[in-house]
Every structure is written in C-alpha cells, then in structure tokens.
Amino acid sequence: MTTQLRVVHLLPLLLACFVQTSPKQEKMKMDCHKDEKGTIYDYEAIALNKNEYVSFKQYVGKHILFVNVATYCGLTAQYPELNALQEELKPYGLVVLGFPCNQFGKQEPGDNKEILPGLKYVRPGGGFVPSFQLFEKGDVNGEKEQKVFSFLKHSCPHPSEILGTFKSISWDPVKVHDIRWNFEKFLVGPDGIPVMRWSHRATVSSVKTDILAYLKQFKTK
C-alpha cells in the first residue's frame, strides 16, 4: 500500500479522534427568566469595612452588575477592567457591586480587613484601589449562601451545563444553577429584575459588548 493510500485510510480515524477529544463549546451568557417574582430591592448586604447594611433599594433606576470576586485568583486582573467598565458606562447608569468569596480554590483566604490591602499591594497590586462598592466576604453557594445570590441564581440559569469536578466543589447542597468560579456576573435592570448572567470564562470586554447591546434595546422600549 502506498503512502498516499495509507493517509487516505487513516484520515477518517484521525478526524474521529479529533472530534472526540475537542472540548465542547461552552456558552458564556444566558438570559434570565422574565417571569421571576421579586426584585433585588428585597435584599441587602454589609459594606466592606463599614459594618453597615446597604439596601439595594438605593440603586433603584440603575443597571447593576453583581460580581463574585477574589483577590488571589487568575481572574483578579479583571478588577481594573471592572473599574474601567463602571467609569465608562456610568453615564448610562451602570453600577458594579463586588462580593468577595472564598468558595472557589480558597482564593479569598483573609478576613475582611485584609481584602483591600491585598488588592493594593499584591493583586492586582501597584496601589490598586477598586472604585466600585465591595461587600463583606460571604458564600454565594450552599447552605450559608447570601440571599441575594439565591435570588440571582434562581432567576438566571447558568450558561454552562458543566458543574465542575467533585474535587472543586466545597459547598453543600449543590444545585444546578450554582456559581462555578470567581468573577461570574449578573446584570440587573433599573427595575431590580435580573436580565442576564455570564460565566467566569466571559471576558469583561465581551460583557461590556453585551451590556451596550442591552442598553441600546432598552432605549428603544
């Protein structure tokens, strides 16, 4: 058998192997349920280092981006990008809210007082200070998850069908719409109703594009 014929015969096997080993394309964004009862104005959280509750009612009329954050994560580089996103879209009424969490890779290990110094001197470092509101560290999944995240997750299906490995899951109970990793994002409209949700794999740039498209549609209503 000639070399050319061998290649012809092997090609289908090589292609089959490629198809089987290629990772499935994950969705990055999912629209939220439109008939969900309640709004984020029913909830509140404790502001970081202030020991006072902030009612989300104060954001009535704003577009709010909820983000679960961590200081020692590979995605911590998104912090400056989130600063820039809020600054650029502030004229449109966008507000970013950050919620430190230690449930994913234990990448927010310190207490609340250590979060801002960690951001300033370690990651992203270089004197970085977040310009958006941060809240006290807490859970976003499991028995002790913050109630606002229970509402957000119930309102918005997760974009990905992949929950993760048992090794990576440290909370209980585990639910299908649980947050998978640091820096997932939820957009809430000016009426307090969740609009869309992004996987942690979505870049801030792609999130910005989606928000701008949403704002354009919003103006035409």
Swiss-Prot record:
A Gene Ontology biological process term: cellular response to oxidative stress
Main location as per UniProt: secreted
Family classification: Belongs to the glutathione peroxidase family.
EC number in record: 1.11.1.9
Tissue/organ expression: Epididymis.
Pfam families on file: GSHPx (PF00255)
Gene responsible for this protein: GPX5
InterPro entries for the chain: Glutathione_peroxidase, GPX_AS, GPX_CS, Thioredoxin-like_sf
Keywords of the record: Oxidoreductase, Peroxidase, Secreted, Signal
Organism (species): Homo sapiens (Human)
Locations listed in the record: Secreted
Catalytic activity: 2 glutathione + H2O2 = glutathione disulfide + 2 H2O
Active site per database record: C73
Lineage per the UniProt record: Eukaryota, Metazoa, Chordata, Craniata, Vertebrata
Protein name: Epididymal secretory glutathione peroxidase
Root EC class: oxidoreductase
GO cellular component, one term: extracellular region
